[in-house]
């Protein structure tokens, strides 16, 4: 393990700080639990760095209360009161979805997914945020 010095220094003309600030796309995939938890853990780190955060939840209904939403909304309030961290914007894109299909709901889910993805594209084009969480966006597609 290197002791504070990289074994190879990239010849890209960038400083270490510039390399650390580059945009990344991180995709968590796999079966079972942990993907959303990992994404929200990264969102906490982004908040601490002062990066404005946006969350798009494609599956969970606005009626459903979740711990991750409560925590990040509390951090958004803390930011508004103290200036610490960063603002957090939250979009719930669906009416709720489950593995049990109800007849007549497929079109609604598809329309919500299309509108949700259009919102993501608008926000990406505007470069409004420093950190984007697209939670469970592959399911509706």
Residue ranges and their predicted role:
Residues 139-141:
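Conserved ATPase-coupling elements of RecA-like P-loop NTPase cores
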